[in-house]
C-alpha cells in the first residue's frame, strides 16, 4: 500500500505545484515583487511538510487498526521504533517528491511528470527484482538506477532487510535537497508564461 500512497502524494504534489503556473496567477505575485525562488521554496516546503505529516498519520492509522485487531499493546520503545521507521520511510517519500517537484519545474506538465515518476517507481521495482540475486555483476548505471530508486528502499524495508538500507538514507536526504536547490536555480532562470 505504501507505493500507492506515493502515487497519491505524487499527484497531489504535481497538481499543487503546477496549478498557479498553469493558470497564470503566479504572475501577480511576481509583479508585486515576490521572487520566484521564494515562491518555489514556499510551495516545495509546503508540499513536503504536508506529505510527511499525511504519511505519518497514514502509518499511525494502520498502527492503531493493527493494535485493535490483534489486541497487542506495544511498549513505548516499540512504538518509538515504529515512529523512527515511519520517519525513515518519510525521508524516502520526500526524496521521491523532490524528484517530482524538480520535474515539474523542468517539464511543467502534470500528466508527463506523473507518468515519468510512476514509470520510475514501478520500473525500479521490476529491475530490482530481476537483479537482486546478482547485484554484484550488474553494470554501474543499473546499480545507480536501482539504489537510487525509492522502491529499492521500500522493498527491502518491507521484507525486513533493514540493515543494508539504512546507509542509503543520507543519499536520499541529500539527493532530495540537491534536487530542490537545482530546481530553485532553474526556477529563478525560467520565464513565467
Where are the language model's segments positioned?
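Active-site-flanking alpha-helical
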Residues: 26, 40, 116
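Transmembrane helix boundary and interhelical loop/hinge segments in multi-pass membrane proteins
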Residues: 13-32, 36, 44
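Terminal transmembrane helical anchor/hairpin motif
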Residues: 73, 114-189, 193
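Secretory targeting signals
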Residues: 1-16, 40-108, 125-126, 133, ...
Amino acid at each position: 500500500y505504501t507505493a500507492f500512497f506515493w502515487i497519491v502524494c505524487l499527484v497531489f504534489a504535481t497538481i499543487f505545484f503546477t496549478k498557479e503556473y498553469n493558470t497564470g496567477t503566479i504572475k501577480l505575485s511576481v509583479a508585486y515583487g515576490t521572487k520566484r525562488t521564494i515562491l518555489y521554496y514556499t510551495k516545495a516546503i509546503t508540499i513536503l511538510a504536508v506529505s510527511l505529516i499525511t504519511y505519518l498519520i497514514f502509518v499511525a492509522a494502520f498502527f492503531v487498526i493493527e493494535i485493535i485487531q490483534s489486541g497487542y499493546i506495544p511498549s513505548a520503545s516499540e512504538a518509538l521504533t515504529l515512529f523512527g521507521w515511519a520517519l525513515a520511510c518519510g525521508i524516502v517519500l520526500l526524496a521521491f517528491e523532490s524528484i517530482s517537484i524538480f520535474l515539474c519545474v523542468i517539464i511543467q506538465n502534470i500528466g508527463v511528470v506523473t507518468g515519468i515518476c510512476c514509470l520510475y517507481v514501478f520500473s525500479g521495482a521490476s529491475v530490482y527484482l530481476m537483479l537482486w540475486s546478482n547485484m554484484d555483476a550488474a553494470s554501474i548505471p543499473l546499480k545507480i538506477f536501482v539504489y537510487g530508486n525509492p522502491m529499492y528502499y521500500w522493498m527491502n524495508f518491507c521484507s525486513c532487510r533493514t540493515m543494508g538500507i539504512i546507509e542509503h538514507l543520507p543519499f536520499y536526504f541529500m539527493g532530495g535537497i540537491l534536487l530542490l536547490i537545482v530546481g530553485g536555480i532553474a526556477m529563478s532562470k525560467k520565464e513565467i508564461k
